[in-house]
Amino acid sequence: MAVDITLLFRASVKTVKTRNKALGVAVGGGADGSRDELFRRSPRPKGDFSSRAREVISHIGKLRDFLLEHRKEYINAYSHTMSEYGRMTDTERDQIDQDAQIFMRTCKDAIQQLRTEAHKEIHSQQVKEHRTAVLDFVEDYLKRVCKLYSEQRAIRVKRVVDKKRLSKLEPEPHTKRKEPASEKSSHNASQDSEEKPAAEDLPEKPLAESQPELGTWGDGKGEDELSPEEIQMFEQENQRLIGEMNSLFDEVRQIEGKVVEISRLQEIFTEKVLQQETEIDSIHQLVVGATENIKEGNEDIREAIKNNAGFRVWILFFLVMCSFSLLFLDWYDS
């Protein structure tokens, strides 16, 4: 009859644990430790495809983080007026454009190389589908980063155009007129400073002698009044300036529309290029399959030709034997 010794076994395990704990031995060798050892899985050897795919994803993520980190400095075209984000020059922005385009092209070539190698290697259908899904995900991630870069570049170009438009609309003649006025005021101030000691030396100078000078300043109000010819001339000038500003605004609107259209076409072009790469890969696979089928067909044709040749030989041998048999029978009868 079987005896239940479960309680005895548990007491023994507890005694062993207590003894090991008292002696300072790690408890990993007990029941829990053995269970952990049983359920502990050895790490899977990572393949070259997985490591390279993760490397490409890491590079694309670094490019995305870089673009988002320097977004405000990159798209800001008024670096000379704003001190908060005005830390990047146009040369640095152009360098970022060049490096980003090279980086995206390199990532695209790496994805293409991975796709080619994945199709060349012999694996099960499940592994092929998994790798195709991974490459599609990486390619979609690269498309999103390219779209982010295209949007930032379109915003930058738009702001550069706005900046040029504002620089054209600045009142340059007004600044030129201020210089003679300042020179005139400084010249008048120097004349006043030179005439002041003379006035102190001659306090009894009659008022009538200084009246002509005051008259020239008092007549300034009359000089401000414009004649009808001058008013008409200024109105014509205003109409001409308004027409120029309207034409400039129309040109700016056209340029903005063209910039937006260019960015949209660039995005479509990028998507079409990636789509064409996928189609080229599929066509390549079809061509490879067709080549293999043609090879198999040629081998079948060779075998059929060999079989037909053997069949003809047997027929010829049969006819020859029949002919000799008839000749022998004819000779025998005669």
From Swiss-Prot:
Disulphide bond pairs:
none
Q: Name the Pfam families on file.
A: Syntaxin-18_N
Q: Where does it live in the cell? A: Endoplasmic reticulum membrane; Golgi apparatus membrane
- Keyword line: Coiled coil, Endoplasmic reticulum, ER-Golgi transport, Golgi apparatus, Membrane, Protein transport, Transmembrane, Transmembrane helix, Transport
Q: Which InterPro entries match?
A: Syntaxin-18_N (IPR019529), Syntaxin/epimorphin_CS (IPR006012)
Q: How does it sit in the membrane?
A: Single-pass type IV membrane protein
Q: Which residues lie on this side of the membrane: Cytoplasmic?
A: 1-308
UniProt biased composition (Basic and acidic residues): 33-50, 166-186, 193-207
Query: What Gene3D superfamilies would the database entry show?
Result: 1.20.5.110
Residue intervals on the Vesicular side:
330-334
Q: Which GO terms describe its biological process?
A: endoplasmic reticulum membrane organization; intracellular protein transport; positive regulation of ER to Golgi vesicle-mediated transport; positive regulation of organelle assembly; regulation of Golgi organization; retrograde vesicle-mediated transport, Golgi to endoplasmic reticulum
The ranges of region (Disordered) come to 29-50, 166-225
**Main localisation:** endoplasmic reticulum
Q: Does the keyword Plastid apply?
A: no
Q: Where are the transmembrane segments?
A: 309-329
Entry GO MF terms: protein domain specific binding; SNAP receptor activity
Name this protein carries in UniProt:
Syntaxin-18
Organism listed in the record: Rattus norvegicus
Q: Which gene encodes it?
A: Stx18
